[in-house]
């Protein structure tokens, strides 16, 4: 089809630009494990229990785009190759120690050894104290890790363009980088995986209480705190340019041969990847309340689960790559402070109905992205993305053995997600795809059989 004229392309032209593509991808996972558990000895509160185990895993991925992609004959569709494999051993041990009738301790540790990034040991300790019937206090502390994915390790190279001024080259040519003579151009960024990535590490702590005054009511409140470091992220463009493009010889910034008398050649491409950089920490409070009672011959349940994010801080490189800067993202784009789920369920004999209210609080829209690729949270106070509430309804029938029939309506009131400008990249449709469901009223039927 010719969008600039009133005629159609002939079939011979369409055939010349049409092709068939074959993309081959495989992923394999092989795992062996063994576990043992049982009692050890008696304590004041009961028998001390232990569980232990070992596991061996092999995993690999291979993604091969069509040869036409690899030769650059297809334009406008991403096709990135990936190939990586690894194996790992792990072992764990856990002890449950009922020190008193009212006090239980849990001790655990896990060791992992990966063929690509090394080994890590992570302990965990938790305690539960019930001084009165129906009243319990709990706390836990532990560390964790996340291994880099095989895609992050073995992702093949892909290309994208970045429009900017090569200010270092302009200065080398004797031009003022702020003048019109120093013109911005499209340059190629080559992105690939990093086989030298390390695991992300974390530390978490929580403390809380649960109260069940009777068979009808149950309440709980928990404070949680999570810290992560060695976060895997893409290297921002500004850091790469400022750190590596002011010299002629660099594995990151690739330049052509300088002209006689020049120090720098024309910029050809910049190589980018994933790296272990930055830290983030978050803490908040979870509150729940549940009510159960016999109503109108059936069983009524009402439950509220509320979460309040008190703080979400992220430390990452500044544009120059000289230091880590801390940003508080609480209430910023995709980080709402408040969320809750309110559920009501009533069952009578083989019939039941359920209503669920889902609420996501408001947050700031995305601030402008500067030349360095860093979100300008401090100086740019953008508009607010409103809160979003949806209602889901469902009726069910369980009169057949092992079979549940359900008819439901998601987003029964046909609410639209609040408008968002977004980041101009992944959110191009006027809503925040990572937080809000754009689907309107959705009617469904479902049959579930368990055996």
Protein language model annotation of sequence segments:
Residues 1-88, 146-199, 220-283, 318, ...:
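Surface-exposed, low-complexity loop segments enriched in small/polar and acidic residues
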């Amino acid at each position: 089809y010719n969008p600039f004229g009133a005629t159609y392309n002939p079939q011979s032209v369409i055939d010349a630009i049409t092709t068939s593509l074959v993309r081959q991808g495989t992923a394999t996972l092989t795992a062996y494990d063994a576990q043992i558990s049982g009692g050890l000895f008696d304590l004041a509160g009961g028998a001390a229990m232990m569980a232990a185990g070992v596991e061996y895993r092999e995993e690999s991925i291979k993604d091969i785009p069509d040869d036409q992609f690899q030769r650059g004959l297809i334009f406008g569709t991403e096709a990135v190759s990936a190939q990586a494999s690894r194996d790992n051993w792990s072992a764990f041990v856990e002890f449950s120690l009922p020190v008193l009738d009212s006090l239980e301790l849990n001790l655990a540790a896990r060791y992992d050894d990966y063929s690509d990034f090394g080994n890590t040991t992570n302990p965990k300790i938790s305690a539960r104290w019930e001084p009165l019937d129906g009243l319990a206090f709990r706390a836990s502390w532990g560390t964790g890790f996340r291994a880099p994915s095989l895609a992050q390790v073995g992702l093949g190279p892909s290309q994208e363009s970045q429009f900017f001024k090569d200010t270092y080259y302009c200065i080398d040519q004797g031009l003022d980088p702020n003048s019109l003579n120093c013109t911005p151009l499209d340059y190629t960024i080559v992105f690939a995986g990093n086989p030298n990535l390390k695991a992300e590490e974390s530390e978490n702590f929580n403390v809380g209480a649960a109260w069940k005054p009777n068979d009808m009511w149950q309440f709980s409140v928990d404070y949680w705190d999570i810290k992560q470091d060695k976060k895997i992220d893409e290297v921002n463009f500004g850091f790469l340019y400022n750190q590596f493009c002011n010299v002629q010889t660099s594995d990151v910034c690739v330049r052509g041969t300088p002209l006689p008398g020049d120090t720098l050649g024309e910029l050809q491409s910049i190589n980018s990847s994933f790296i272990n950089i930055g830290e983030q920490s978050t803490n908040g409070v979870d509150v729940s309340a549940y009510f159960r009672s016999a109503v109108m011959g059936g069983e009524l349940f009402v439950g509220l689960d509320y979460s309040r994010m008190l703080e979400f801080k992220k430390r990452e490189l500044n544009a120059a790559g000289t230091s880590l800067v801390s940003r508080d993202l609480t209430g910023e784009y995709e980080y709402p402070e408040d969320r809750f789920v309110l559920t009501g369920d009533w069952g009578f004999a083989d019939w039941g109905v359920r209503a669920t209210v889902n609420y996501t609080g408001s947050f700031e829209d995305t601030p402008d992205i500067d030349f360095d690729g860093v979100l300008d949270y401090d100086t740019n106070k953008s508009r607010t993305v409103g809160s979003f509430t949806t209602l889901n309804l469902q009726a069910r029938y369980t009169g057949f053995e092992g079979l549940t029939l359900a008819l439901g309506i998601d987003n029964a009131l046909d609410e639209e997600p609040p408008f968002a400008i977004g980041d101009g990249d992944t959110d191009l449709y006027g809503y925040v795809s990572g937080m809000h469901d754009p689907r309107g009223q959705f009617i469904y039927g479902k049959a579930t059989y368990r055996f």
